Amino acid sequence: MSKKPVALIILDGFALRDEDKGNAVTHAKKPNFDRFWNEYPHATLQASGEAVGLPEGQMGNSEVGHLNIGAGRIVYQSLTRVNVAIREGEFEQNETLLAAVKHAKEKGTNLHLFGLLSDGGVHSHIEHLYALLRLAKSEGLEKVYIHGFLDGRDVAPQSAETYLKELNEKIEEYGVGEIATLSGRYYSMDRDKRWERVEKSYRAMVYGEGPSYTSAEECVKDSYDNGIYDEFVLPSVITKEDGSPVATIQDEDAVIFYNFRPDRAIQISNTFANEDFRSFDRGEKHPKHLHFVCLTHFSETVDGYVAFKPINLDNTLGEVLSQNNLKQLRIAETEKYPHVTFFMSGGREAEFPGETRILIDSPKVATYDLKPEMSAYEVTDALLAEIEGDKQDAILLNFANPDMVGHSGMLEPTVKAIETVDECLGKIVDAILAKGGTAIITADHGNADEVITLEGNPMTAHTTNPVPVIVTKQGLELREDGILGDLAPTMLTLLDVAQPKEMTGKTLIK
């Protein structure tokens, strides 16, 4: 029997903005998106700030977006949870954080703090590092070392000096902390199994290997002089006057990894925390008996303590589809596969009964502006086969291109990325319509809508602009005040499935 699938198609990083300058969305030729927008009911959704459980004005991101979409409700994010804990005095009483400090004190070893040095709020927030420094000081710990990952992606590409200046002021104010290594996030926060990058960061932190400098500022200046900006700064070692490293991570040290977003934290965490790690040779000096703390739950694969444990999300979209014996497909390429599976399932790694997953490998290129098409065509071919085979009742699809290429801050490659996705979108939606099905076309956050600032500088961060939503079914009217948490209830309405009470979002269909 022919299925009439309902598909949720997420154009990652594709938001709407009136200003044309630096806007790859308006510059791109996208006849299919425009056709669906003009022919079918459409509206915009809020995908940032309080609408997705973030602080007011905070840009959304893929993890947050997919959590909200899959949960069918506003999910209060780790950034908000940790901020509230700091504000209300709960952070300094967190038993897991205190246990790490106690371990270092009792063993007479060092406490290492590592994470992203910015206030981007996507993977980390520098205020959380400052809170950890205050905690260490209040507990009388003196040997505290910082391994800073430079951002330049969720914030301006050359902003490291600003954050280092502020960090050094805090170190002086609190009387605790010293920078031991610096590394661009390209190396320390890889998520695509490019272990040669992670290894460089690891060896800087453990072996003191890599370019050496007498200060963090000297490291950044030298990198800038060589045309290497924050995200791509080589893992580097800060040295004392005698040329030896300020500190390396050694046996029985304590580590607190203060990033809160899991996807780019897993690989480097496994490198330190897991005894059975085999992805590269860690060498004889690999620190044994580390007390390793993750700020949040990164993955079942990470053997570490968790300071802020997950909030259980019951009756997510995937679970409800499964309970109603509907076949569902999750499909994406590598870069967004965790988002359309793990995050969309509320932090659940396992498949639900009746769930199929298709992972298409992302291309092995240094940066995606070199191949803006990424693997969109391969994703499309795989999905068209599923649609033609009448295999699925519900389809959850992510196209990574607008976001991943948008992060380059380059207009032409991002335009090419959107034009590629538009071509694929046309084929997929037309195939769904031919089966009598319906597509919900939307996005999780902004990015490609501003890749060049009004001043003409590269813009590599996300935006707070609203995202589109199109429902390819005539005779409907959509609300204009929607949020990402309303998408799952909308999909359930189209599938004629009752919405569970845990889903507090509201269908967009009037």
From Swiss-Prot:
It catalyses: (2R)-2-phosphoglycerate = (2R)-3-phosphoglycerate. It is an enzyme of class 5 (isomerase). Its cofactor is Mn(2+). The active site is at S62. Pathway: Carbohydrate degradation; glycolysis; pyruvate from D-glyceraldehyde 3-phosphate: step 3/5. GO terms for cellular component: cytosol. Monomer. This is 2,3-bisphosphoglycerate-independent phosphoglycerate mutase. It comes from Priestia megaterium (strain ATCC 12872 / QMB1551) (Bacillus megaterium).
